[in-house]
Amino acid sequence: MTLDDIENNNNDHGQFMPMYDEGVNFPSYSNNFQPLKIEKNDKEDRQVTCSIVLFVLGFLLLIPWIINVINIKSKNKMARGFSIASVVLFSLSIAIIVIFVIFFIFLITSLHNSHREDR
């Protein structure tokens, strides 16, 4: 195939060969893939781990739930969620304990008073 054949849009097989102007820009098909940069934030990971541990320990003891308030202003949503859940569960637990204590105080005093009246 010669330059004249190309200019005349003919090749050896008689098929049309398109001509392109030199000023035409064609898209580049090179691989421009950039891997996603993952920055591990150790501080946030520690906050989440600490928050989860305190949340789980709160079921055994009440104190870890109130200690978990340290993560309530965390930028990490998961740490903040566990912290809020811990504070809510701590409040509910204290309310239930107070109700039971008041109930038992009334129960004991009423039993004590009824026992006195029986004498």
Curated annotation (Swiss-Prot):
Entry superkingdom: Eukaryota
This protein's record includes keyword Transmembrane helix: yes
Subcellular location per the Swiss-Prot or TrEMBL entry: Membrane
Major localisation: membrane
Membrane topology of this protein: Multi-pass membrane protein
Transmembrane portions of the chain: 52-72, 88-108
Keyword annotations from UniProtKB, A to Z: Membrane, Transmembrane, Transmembrane helix
One annotated Gene Ontology cellular component of this protein: membrane
The protein's name: Uncharacterized transmembrane protein DDB_G0281147
Organism: Dictyostelium discoideum (Social amoeba)
